[in-house]
Amino acid sequence: MSSTGVLKGAVAVVTGGASGMGLATVRRFVAEGASVVVADLNVEAGERVAAELEHAVRFERCDVSVEADVAAAVRAAVDSFGQLNIMFNNAGMGGAFGPITEIESDDWDTTFAVLVRGVFNGTKHAARQMIEQGAGGSIINTASVAGLGGGGGPQAYSAAKAAVINLTETTANELAAHSIRVNAICPGIIFTPLMHRGDEADAETVMSELQPLPKRGEGSDIAGAALWLAGPDAAFVTGTSIVVDGGISSAGTRLYGRLGGTQNLDRVVGIAHGTTGQAASVRRL
């Protein structure tokens, strides 16, 4: 893919940037001229990314549910590269999974701590820095098609992603006066390391059966959306959620009918989150 240098001179923090959609976005941002702080729990993977991309990337160990860690990642961007222009709140987890009667309260709370508080922490500290700089900026949050409406998805994950969409809209309204744009990306079934924990062949079958578009969702598809939201072509875009799902959400109720009911829907969700055949348990990306 050719580069246009659309992010030349920009500085970004990407949480969950050591794998999956985050890593694809880090590589795309760097290819377009940005410097990036990769904020991730996985030290080995994060250091590997920093070594691969050398001077353009700094790794910072970060648990997004811990505010001090996120604040440190923002400081790392300023200390290493002089500013912060883009914040991609992408770190996530499959979350508490299983029947509502079986989910443990602690697992529910952990899911929200990572998926919602993590976005809050990132938005808060990125906005503080961007306001201080006085030059605007772009904050991008990873939500999900599961957060767009009720359905048969995992309760904790779906509810948390709905909260991310709402948080995106409210903070976009608040921060617009500072020329800070806040948007969300709603992926569908994206083939990431999390999915590798499930049945890869089954995942391929599920995606080909359910998506109107006959292609596998890849991290690069999310990276493309993030690049657009981060760059000047989206200068008039804020408070919106971009759906990148191969058409799954447009299938509406037809999707549920094609799945054949709750049992198969649970199977699909299990594949997508690498939790097939397991009890309600928290699994981090």
What are these regions (language model features)?
Residues 128, 173-177, 235:
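Alpha-helical segment proximal to the catalytic Tyr-Lys
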Residues 43-44, 62-72, 105, 220:
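The beta1-alpha1 cofactor-binding region of Rossmann-like NAD(H)/NADP(H)-dependent oxidoreductases
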Residues 184, 202-237, 242-246, 273-285:
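C-terminal helical subdomain
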Residues 4-37:
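Canonical Rossmann dinucleotide-binding motif of NAD(H)/NADP(H)-dependent dehydrogenases/reductases
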Residues 144:
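Residue(s) in the substrate-gating loop at a strand-loop-helix junction
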Residues 98-100, 104-112, 207:
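Substrate-binding pocket helix/loop in short-chain dehydrogenase/reductase
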Residues 123, 160, 168:
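Active-site helix of classical SDR
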